[in-house]
């Protein structure tokens, strides 16, 4: 780290830099997923299968709404990474200030809309009647906590854009440990049920955001802004929106397909919902390395594009994809032997139907993890390069795939069809993303050549 607690990713071995930057991210994501797993285990084991299904039934809509907020925050950090790579401190600070103001506005709007529409959303999703009330209790708290989500994601994005992936992870780990403790306190001691599980999530994330504020105030002068930096500038706001909104919509568009799929699975009953919930939680844990590599590539490509080092972007993408593919093969082989034991963490072995369906879902998805590697590495690389719109279209491909499975095949073939929804989504997204990356790289290289030629 430099004196500004930042790291320059424009020099040095791409593979070494990617591993060094992604490992702290991976550690944080693993802790986050450990919390998610513990949360699900506590709900499933100490409350009921109905409570597990209720929390699981909200997963796709949470992904749609919370994912939009996270995507926007991630997009807002990309111009900052580019300005850091270009050594433009004045522009960097202006983006930091403007992103903060715009994020406050987004937080207010999103919180108000989602809280007001919470009940209607669950009805539209065909939530089973026996879990509707529990699902509402959980979802309303998550929506009310959107400002806490935006606070942490925005500030951690600021830090990562400067090459600092360690501090956000430390605060995330603190939040995850706190979250587990609060889960146990609220559910086992205070008997707050699924409401307590949601409240623990929001409270711990808010604390992690406050920790980011304290750290930045004390240790990162590069992110300190003046009153002038907080005045909205139309050109800066426009660039933030060009980067942030496509990333937010990418998450939401992808999630729309997940919502449609979840709605179809909801129609199969609580057993199917619980099965997909357990398997999805395990899968989310297993794919953390892909998410870490993706987040790394966004910062890596952003800094290198800012420094006009486009060939390093290509080399970095290849390195990240190879690392992820090797891991994919290893984890699939491991799951062949341990999948059922992981499922037993969520439900009793006596729940044979849930175990069988969860096993089928998990192994089917794991077989297609290599396409998922490419989705993460290529998409985030394109976003870091400044072409967020292309990444959004990949989200459309994923939405189409999941919607097709949910609307057409699940009603005919049942739960087995749902198992292939994500694999099909990943393959269709890759069919768009790989050519899009080649196009974006050529476009940047051509622009650089034109600038050089114009000097002579």
What are these regions (language model features)?
Residues 1-22, 80-145, 189-245, 301-368, ...:
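Short alpha-helical transmembrane segments in multi-pass integral membrane proteins
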Residues 52-112, 149-168, 275-339, 372-386, ...:
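Small-residue-rich hydrophobic transmembrane alpha-helices
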Residues 73, 141-160, 168-176, 197-212, ...:
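Short runs within selected transmembrane alpha-helices of multi-pass transporters and secretion channels
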Residues 64-67, 179-183, 209-213, 285-288, ...:
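Hydrophobic transmembrane alpha-helices of multi-pass small-molecule transporters
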Residues 20-39, 141, 175, 204-208, ...:
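Transmembrane helical elements of multi-pass membrane transporters/channels
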Residues 30, 34-52, 122-129, 185-192, ...:
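Helix-terminus/linker motif at the lipid-water interface of multi-pass membrane proteins
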Residues 9-46, 60-75, 79, 104-111, ...:
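N-terminal transmembrane alpha-helices
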Residues 20, 43-63, 129-134, 194-195, ...:
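Interfacial/gating helices of multi-pass transporter permease domains
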């Amino acid at each position: 780290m430099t004196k500004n607690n930042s790291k320059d990713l424009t020099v040095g071995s791409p593979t070494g830099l990617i591993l060094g930057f992604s490992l702290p991210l991976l550690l944080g994501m693993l802790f986050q997923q450990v919390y998610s797993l513990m949360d699900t285990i506590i709900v499933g084991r100490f409350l009921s299968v109905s409570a597990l299904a209720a929390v699981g039934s909200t997963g796709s809509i949470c992904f749609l709404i919370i994912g939009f907020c996270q995507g926007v925050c991630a997009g807002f950090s990309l111009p900052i990474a580019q300005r850091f790579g270009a050594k433009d401190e004045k522009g960097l600070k202006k983006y930091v200030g403007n992103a903060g103001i715009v994020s406050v506005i987004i937080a207010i709007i999103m919180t108000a809309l989602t809280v007001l529409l919470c009940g209607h959303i669950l009805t539209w999703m065909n939530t089973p009647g026996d879990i509707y009330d529990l699902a509402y209790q959980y979802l309303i708290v998550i929506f009310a906590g959107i400002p806490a989500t935006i606070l942490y994601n925005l500030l951690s994005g600021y830090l990562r854009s400067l090459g600092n992936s360690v501090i956000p992870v430390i605060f995330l780990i603190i939040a995850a440990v706190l979250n587990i403790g609060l889960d146990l306190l609220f559910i086992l001691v205070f008997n707050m049920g699924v409401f307590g599980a949601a409240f623990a999530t929001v409270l711990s994330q808010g604390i992690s955001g406050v920790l980011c504020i304290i750290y930045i105030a004390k240790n990162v002068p590069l992110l300190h802004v003046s009153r002038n930096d907080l005045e909205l500038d139309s050109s800066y706001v426009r660039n933030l929106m060009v980067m942030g909104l496509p990333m937010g919509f990418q998450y939401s568009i992808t999630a729309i397909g997940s919502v449609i799929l979840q709605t179809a699975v909801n129609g199969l009953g609580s057993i199917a919902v619980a099965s997909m919930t357990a398997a999805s939680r395990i899968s989310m844990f297993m794919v953390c390395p892909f998410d870490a590599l993706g987040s790394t590539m966004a910062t890596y490509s952003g800094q290198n594009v800012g420094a006009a080092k486009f060939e390093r972007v290509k080399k970095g993408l290849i390195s990240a994809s190879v690392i992820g593919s090797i891991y994919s093969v290893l984890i699939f082989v491991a799951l062949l032997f341990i999948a059922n034991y992981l499922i037993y963490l969520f439900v009793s072995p006596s729940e044979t139907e849930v175990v069988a369906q969860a096993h089928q879902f998990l192994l089917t998805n794991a077989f297609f993890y290599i396409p998922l590697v490419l989705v993460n590495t290529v998409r985030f690389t394109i976003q870091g390069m400044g072409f967020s719109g292309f990444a959004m279209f990949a989200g459309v491909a994923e939405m189409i795939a999941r919607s097709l499975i949910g609307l057409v095949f699940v009603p005919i073939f049942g739960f087995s069809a749902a198992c292939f929804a994500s694999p099909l989504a990943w393959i269709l997204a890759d069919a768009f993303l790989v050519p899009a990356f080649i196009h974006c790289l050529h476009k940047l290289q051509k622009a650089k050549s034109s600038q050089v030629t114009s000097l002579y």
